[in-house]
Amino acid sequence: MQIALLGLGKMGKNIAQKLLAEGHHVVVWNRSREVLEQFRNEKSEFVIKEQLHITHSIEDLRDTLQKPRLIWVMLPSGEPTERILEELRDGIVDHGDIVIDGGNANYKDTERRFKVFQAINVKYLGIGVSGGIHGLENGYPMMVGGDKSAYEYIGNILDSLAKPNGGHTYFGEGGAGHFVKMVHNGVEYGMMQAIAEGVGVLAKSPYKLNLVSVGNNWQRGSIVSSFLMWAAVSALIKDPTLAQFDGYIDAKGEGEWTVQVAKELNVPTPVIEQALEFRKRSQYDIGVQDTFVAKMVAALRHEFGGHEIHKVETKSVEEVSK
């Protein structure tokens, strides 16, 4: 199939690579020309085969793509995504085309956008994509919401991205997929915090435990075995003291949104809420930053998501609360 992918960040680049490897024809755009040219050079064999097309202009998509146009937006949530979607809506896509937002959008934004595109007869999908930087090799788990006929149409694309161990599920219209992904990330907050706290206790035990050995033991069929536990072991193998991590933990929107929605629905979420609060404190409280627990959460984020290792620029409580 032919698809345009807008955004060559960590996830977008890997998705483009996987689609090319699976034989799809991919048109890529990125705001930075340098990033585009680097990708062109890295994937020159696909350019030669005319399987990869680089475009510097969103407007080119109107004439470059076959009907129905299939455009996957993989940009940071909020303003960057909103701006590109407006460009697409105002002159690029029309009747029968399909637009996909594969970023971590707020499900309420997805619900609104679904209706806006529906009004101009463009099919809209919001797809929550998990798997981090390992999705390229392992396959992506995808949580889909929006137009069901569009989901069925792009099944071949999603099957390619899911190989070998991922998958995709349609959850309903509008923002359903991004709602499921939001809660997934909230659960992720709680699980990461629990693993980090457990490892923190082990690190201070009187038995001089080998943390990698403990983690490997727990991965052999125990109740707490998981991809996150694997990530913890992997991080500890590389840096047993986690000295390279400063204990500053970013808190993206999904954890906050999960807590907010839970309150709206009168659902208690103390574990997720405390994990979120711990992350916020790590951004200004040196006492938290210096703990093995905070360093472990930061290490987990880096290990599975490729998130940057911060050099602390301590923020005030007021800045973090904004």
Predicted region positions:
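NAD(P)-dependent Rossmann-like dehydrogenase/reductase catalytic/cofactor-binding core
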Residues: 1-8, 17, 22, 29-31, ...
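NAD(P)+-binding Rossmann beta1-loop-alpha1 motif at the extreme N-terminus of oxidoreductases
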Residues: 1-69, 93-96, 133-136, 302
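Structural beta-sheet core signal
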Residues: 28, 73, 99-101
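Rossmann-fold dinucleotide-binding core
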Residues: 81-84, 100, 106-197, 202, ...
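Short, conserved loop/helix-junction motifs that constitute active-site signature segments
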Residues: 90-95, 266
